[in-house]
């Protein structure tokens, strides 16, 4: 069975790809550039990870309309990337409004064309930034939309294998599957060394700390988040 993997190049999408690969799916990898600050590094990570898993069927999409819409510090350079607040309950400025719905729509379109029956996305509801489009209920609803909006003979379902996992569990799962974490990129701010202090870096570093392992990528700072 063929599956589309939404592969940003980050830690979660890497482990999701490793899981789909281990389950024996024929993988097709999709990457979206949406005008984010670190798009060069994320695209590089996507290509390296796709090479690692020998994924030949790939789609790189330009969706910079999200940068034109704005509203996120990832795409609007007038908004600073805020430092990590792992105890806060508010949605951080890095949230890109309704981004995942757009990504999923593109993935469903491609899946329908190439005959893929599954779409894997590395969304995490637990132990994450609290983005509303990373909740299980959102993906359950989107599966209903797919059933209504595709051809009757189409059978496409979204798979979210990480949705209820803690970040440290994701690290351990990746290690179990020998996922190449050194090829992935999570930093929202930098394309040289990861900053170590943005929300995404903090969640990643804390996950590795809790898993009792050292993150293999380079950081400008490595604060202790435990």
Curated annotation (Swiss-Prot):
Protein name as annotated: 7-cyano-7-deazaguanine synthase
Binding site for ATP: 7-17
SUPFAM superfamilies tied to this protein: Adenine nucleotide alpha hydrolases-like (SSF52402)
InterPro entries hit by this protein: QueC, Rossmann-like_a/b/a_fold
Reactions mediated catalytically: 7-carboxy-7-deazaguanine + NH4(+) + ATP = 7-cyano-7-deazaguanine + ADP + phosphate + H2O + H(+)
A GO BP entry: queuosine biosynthetic process
Cofactor(s) the protein requires to work: Zn(2+)
């Amino acid at each position: 069975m063929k599956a589309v993997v939404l592969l940003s190049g980050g830690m979660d999408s890497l482990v999701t790809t490793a899981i789909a690969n281990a389950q024996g799916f024929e993988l097709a990898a999709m990457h979206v550039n949406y005008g984010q600050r670190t798009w060069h590094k994320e695209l590089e990570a996507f290509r390296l990870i796709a090479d690692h898993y020998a994924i030949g069927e790939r789609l790189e999409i330009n969706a910079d309309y999200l940068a034109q819409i704005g509203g996120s510090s990832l795409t609007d350079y007038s908004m600073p990337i805020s430092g990590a607040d792992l105890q806060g309950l508010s949605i951080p400025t890095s949230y890109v409004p309704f981004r995942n719905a757009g990504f999923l729509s593109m993935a469903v379109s491609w899946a329908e064309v190439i005959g893929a029956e599954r779409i894997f996305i590395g969304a995490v509801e637990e132990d994450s930034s609290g983005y509303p489009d990373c909740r299980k209920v959102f993906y359950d609803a989107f599966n209903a939309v797919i059933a209504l909006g595709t051809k009757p003979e189409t059978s496409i379902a979204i798979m979210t294998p990480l949705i209820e996992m803690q970040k440290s569990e994701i690290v351990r799962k990746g290690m179990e599957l020998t996922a190449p974490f050194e090829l992935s990129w999570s930093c929202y701010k930098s394309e040289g060394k990861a900053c170590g202090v943005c929300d995404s870096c903090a969640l990643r570093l804390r996950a590795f700390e809790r898993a009792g392992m050292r993150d293999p990528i380079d950081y400008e700072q490595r604060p202790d988040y435990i």
